Amino acid sequence: FHVDKPETPGYKIELPEDGAKQIVEKKSDTVEEVDIASLLAMGDLAHGEKVFKKCSACHVVDKGGENKIGPALYGVLGRKVAAIESYKYSSAMAAYDKEWTFEEMNGYLKKPQSHIKGTKMAFAGLRKEKDRASVILYLNQNSDSPLPLP
């Protein structure tokens, strides 16, 4: 049995000349802003604790918990981004001069690398809105002073 090696590896996909443009336009048409109150209403604390197990390889959420690969997240909502002095953040994260609001956390959890370009967090993100909403509620609960929900 013998198979000749192709000149160029891969598959050729034929598109109409304006096909790529149509695909890009269609994708951008579906982008919509999420109302954070509606998003958080989808959340569930028990589900958030379960989903957070993906995060627990690198983060702790216990009061007084030590930094791991990532910073400790107890009381993260409402505090300044990159605020834990004992953790060495990426320069991108350290320069990101914002506070962890519900909206900021939602954007970051959705796609960390896109939300803060240059972050060293390698996690791809949480695609499902319910997962993000639940983790945000779980993080907010793990605080001495949880933020009031919108």
Segments from the language model and where they lie:
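C-terminal capping alpha-helices of c-type cytochrome domains
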Residues: F1-H2, E99-P150
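The canonical Cys-X-X-Cys-His
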Residues: G48, F52-V61, V135-L139
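Gly/Gly-Pro-rich "capping" loops immediately C-terminal to redox-active cysteine motifs
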Residues: E49, K63-F102, A122-L126
